[in-house]
Amino acid sequence: MYVRRADTEDRVVLERLWLMFRHDMSEFQGQLPRPDGSYRTEWLEKVLTGDPDWAGYLFYSGESPVGFCFMRALSQPVRVLNAFFMVRPVRRNGLGLRAVREVLAHHPGPVDVAFQENNPKAVRFWHRVATEVSGDVWTSERRPIAGKPDATPDVWISFQNTTTERSTSP
């Protein structure tokens, strides 16, 4: 597996992976697709239009795209790992942790990650990431979702990222 920065040429691949990601998330957020079958895309558009405060990364196994990660708040003191997705055949074999570590190597310093408490696999995964990256020096708190007062709050993990490993293979 290798990780590379996404750019505007990756629109079709990212749009397809994004649809799978949003479909997966709908199980935990209750979000239905729009009438055209799509889901919200504002984060995707931030990455694809080159917003300087956002960065997207694609994960590949050989020639096959197997996931992505979006980072935001790049000019802020605390960066946010905003979206993370791996296709099902490559989950639970260590590639997700490896991909996150490679992305984080580009963004040292404090990092926040939000996830849904009703997603037990995400809870285990993000706790493991925080522990692998920063030992036992991380925090977890529930924060309300902006503009959605009736929604279940997200869980946010905060840690100091000191990851430096990067993939050198194409």
Predicted regions and their residues:
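A short beta-loop-alpha structural element at the N-terminal edge
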Residues: 1-19, 25
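Short secondary-structure junctions
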Residues: 3-4, 134-142
